[in-house]
């Protein structure tokens, strides 16, 4: 309790402490901030208050200085936008994070670079297991060329040569960060450096000399102090003294401009002979930047109003000049090889979480539940256990024991379980209560970040207690052996908020069969979902699902459908065939509801307009979609309104539904079907 702690230790309330601390910060830093220009830029390209997003980075100005490209998260994805130099025209060129060959844009090491003619730009994205160098049209975003770099662990910071025939980049391989030059026509990858020093930020001058930042020196055990180096095609020479940490590098009129720490923030300095000319004076730091061919237009990414924003400077003027020697206060760190003994890793488990509860009932006696999770130090092995039990009958307890092997690209799941379920028997002649004791093994193989194959096999031993439909026990018990096979495929590139997906798509298709049993059947099913976000909090959501059970005992293993709102409390549809269609328009309903009594505040209540339709049926029933008069025949449908309030782990959902056959309401308008429950958006 922070308030009680403050009262006891400092003898002041939280409110008084907050006020005094705020005054102390102002007294300490306001005089310091007066030495900086808070808003010295000329044009602000991005603004989180208008566009949304908090991370706008890697701006690159075209050689002509008339436009720029940058990476932004304004749509919650990492996208590449083009903008006029005034910021009035902006357009999305590349959508990131939604397909296997554009998994991510390496936001912590991102760089975009225009070709010399300004018609194209280069960028790097993560593909399915390797990095890809892209060249795209700077006005349409069309991908013109893509070069996978499967021989390297990663690539960063692409930079066009003045003739547009080569691209310099940083390549990562076996723990090394080295400079490479990629020849576009021949696809030859030329290695410029080959050592354990860190080489970053390659860029060309107009004569074709390659500049980059590096901590290379005569002692391989010293690192962390950077200088600018120049490669003329034959040899590498140091162009500046060591200057500590260099945060970025670009060229202006064939002179290096570096982002350096100065007075506890990061500003830009142009290297001119033996001098450093400071050309920015911001308090919050500049993290990446670029110049046009003339050097008169500069785009930069800086911290502004709580976000990383892109701004434009027009002909940035010198702020002051420092002797380069007086600035070289960086120091090397010395790596000292350590003596160690190598031992083979042994798997050892420790408990990560444990939860449980217990109680006593005069009807059942002692009862409780327990769940716990254990893993090894590397996270490659997991064991998860969950159970409930009743003291009077431990043999009928429910439990699940899972072992997860996560070391390889493919994952394995071994499971042993016992649980109870409700089913059917002898073509729906009886209702069954089944005790399922069994085990299974599943293998998961991800093709990429979005697509996965699942395959498995298992065995269930069912003890089936048969009941009549009125709930009377028949006295009959059936024992069934069910070995099964399973195959599934899933796709998911949806963007998730805490309460559910808001953009993208999800799809799953699976098949399961019991080939050798007294309960033989085969099942196929699919579920596809698509989300269209038309504005930040306004979403159209659609879902279509369906399936079919085949085989001798198809009627004993039906689908049970309850996803048609308005009908789910009044009827349960089951059969060996089913389909469900759900559609919603989701929107903010109440941003804040403040009640006088009880004194509570409900924040961000969301709303949705929905239409649902679906049904499940047996082959013997027959199925007809429409009646002769155009109304629904077999399917059931409803429309209505839904309100949702997220409480941290689930939504409290209130549905108001009117049932319809598409010609008329099946319920009076004033008597809809209400449902109140916990859940999440599909």
Where are these regions (language model features)?
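Repeated loop/turn-to-beta-strand initiation elements of outer-membrane beta-barrel proteins
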Residues: 89, 188, 378-383, 407-414, ...
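Conserved beta-propeller blade repeats
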Residues: 51-71, 89-90, 97-124, 143-170, ...
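Transmembrane beta-strands of outer-membrane beta-barrel pores
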Residues: 216, 359-362, 376, 387-391, ...
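Outer-membrane beta-barrel initiation region
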Residues: 308, 314-409, 413, 477-501, ...
